[in-house]
């Protein structure tokens, strides 16, 4: 009656019905005659590439196939709106990536407006035309994936957009469009010594203000010895295939995640610098 369909996290397929009957269930509830329903079911099945599986039961399908059945059931009624509630959370990483591409393709082919709920940054960026970030029931920011990725409005949105490092400190100096931050966990007094410096892109902050600098791991680089920056002691290094990512700790105990080009040894002393254009500064 409301003109929208929903795809659930747990698929919610009828286990005793064939794939075809699951897809056509909404049409039967709407009283669509069989002669009209048949071609629409065929179209939806073809759209999700399951025409050859229509006589099977859901239990005979893989998780990805079951999810596609749920999507076909949602679009077969030709709704004006489709709501997808974390539909990929039960799938493994490889299948999630494949299904993201399938959902995008199906969305473009069906033309239905789709609201997709997710806690996954990659899903949001790859699927959305516009992203709405919400926290505690309130809208934090609305924009295109590029707008939110490059300029999150606050630390909450920055966290969702992959700014894994969020380090407190005070503004020490301004250099054109950038500021230098003295990083320190306890910023009670401007005269307190800091454990290192990072340069970032500020908003409307003044010298001496308490701030938080947010930076993604791959926007931190290892500096040559003697260069200014943020000193860390290496705790561990992970090999990620395309490179390495390390966890370091500052002299005042803050953890710092950063990219590197080799396997680092625990206890190794390094100095890190941030790309000023990619490190964002927020009020504390």
Where are these regions (language model features)?
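Non-catalytic connector elements of ABC transporters
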Residues: 164, 174-284
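ABC ATPase nucleotide-binding domains
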Residues: 1-159
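Short beta-strand-centered aromatic/proline hotspots
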Residues: 169
